[in-house]
Amino acid sequence: MSAIVDIVGREVLDSRGNPTVECDVLLESGVMGRAAVPSGASTGSREAIELRDGDKSRYLGKGVLNAVKNINTEISEAVLGLDAAEQSFLDKTLIDLDGTDNKGRLGANAMLAVSMAVARAAAEESGLPLYRYFGGMGAVQLPVPMMNVINGGAHANNSLDLQEMMIIPVGAPSFREAVRWGAEVFHALKKILHDKGISTAVGDEGGFAPSVESHEAAIQLILQAIDKAGYRAGEQIALGLDCAASEFYKDGKYHLEGEGLSLTAQEWTDMMAAWVDKYPIISIEDGMAEGDWDGWKLLTDRLGKNVQIVGDDLFVTNTKILKEGIEKGIANSILIKINQIGTLSETFAAIEMAKRAGYTAVISHRSGETEDSTIADIAVATNAGQIKTGSMSRSDRMAKYNQLLRIEEDLGDVAVYPGRAAFYNLR
């Protein structure tokens, strides 16, 4: 038995300079696991609650001392002596202890930090890398990265309403090559922007945040960069969008303020469909607002056979909401964010439910990240096939890419890079 003998929570800082929760878990054998949780900017209204102090005299009210206190008192008392190898029992203990539907009492940030740190300690105790501990011998598939090269919306201060424009190296022969292709396109895009006199400042997730006249102009810049780097758009590198449409949905319409447009769900669907016809876009995330289920149905019926339609704010990594979406034929993919739900067991349950329904599961970072690379291991452990973890800059993003490079090396000849096959929800 790998008994938990000590737990220490602390307040650390994320990539935006805001406080977040880190936790150390010590086992009887002397082995320690450490984990830090991320934090989002554009958040779904039904996400598990991230506990913040609200004390304006500290960190503008964003301190997490109450969450840390919960770890060091109540949570510690409940889990000391438990077997770290019993992840599902530990997570259920945390859920029952919290007693709310949204983890609002103890805080999803406190609970997730403990859940992750316990898993890390148990993996260390077993002598296995984290991906192997979670996934067993079948964990051999690297994820296709969706690299956010142009940021807008809540992730940047520019004229773009859509939050992310991504490159997806579907034609690469390996993860290592996929990363190289992405880096080369990133640097080609930087040169193009520089030569046009456009800012090369980066947003929260490491992508560029240019002010350009339209979303199509931004897409065309990416296509130029793919060509300049020596790759073929569509065949080798596809495109993905994260609209984060809840952020610009108001009074029943979608307001693209940067372009002076106010659109119904039908008109907005028509606009996205026109982009899909014109450009090699194979994935659209949060194309509709989280509450506009009629709009989601419209979008899924129109584009869902040829385009991955990903629910993020829509599903918030929650199996109850995902089940409803599957029954109603809404979307064909779920974005997986561990801090939206607050424990690893519930995260794995959402991935499993998606796969059983023929939906893909895209493992994702948050805009406020840390050096913690757990999501890289989760992507391989679950054979998810896809990961979103930012652009080719900022060490909080590179930590995940670098961990995946290590995992691919560790797997050696058995490593699989699925490429376009990762999009098994498309016909």
Curated annotation (Swiss-Prot):
Pathway: Carbohydrate degradation; glycolysis; pyruvate from D-glyceraldehyde 3-phosphate: step 4/5. SMART domains: Enolase_C (SM01192), Enolase_N (SM01193). The active site is at E205 (proton donor), K337 (proton acceptor). Binds a second Mg(2+) ion via substrate during catalysis. GO terms for molecular function: magnesium ion binding; phosphopyruvate hydratase activity. The keyword Metal-binding applies. It is an enzyme of class 4 (lyase). Its cofactor is Mg(2+). SUPFAM superfamilies: Enolase C-terminal domain-like, Enolase N-terminal domain-like. Keywords: Cytoplasm, Glycolysis, Lyase, Magnesium, Metal-binding, Secreted. InterPro entries: Enolase (IPR000941), Enolase-like_C_sf (IPR036849), Enolase-like_N (IPR029017), Enolase_C (IPR020810), Enolase_CS (IPR020809), Enolase_N (IPR020811). (2R)-2-phosphoglycerate binds at Q163, K337, R366, S367, K388. Its EC number is 4.2.1.11. It catalyses: (2R)-2-phosphoglycerate = phosphoenolpyruvate + H2O. Mg(2+) binds at D242, E285, D312. Catalyzes the reversible conversion of 2-phosphoglycerate (2-PG) into phosphoenolpyruvate (PEP). It is essential for the degradation of carbohydrates via glycolysis. Belongs to the enolase family. This is Enolase. It comes from Leptothrix cholodnii (strain ATCC 51168 / LMG 8142 / SP-6).
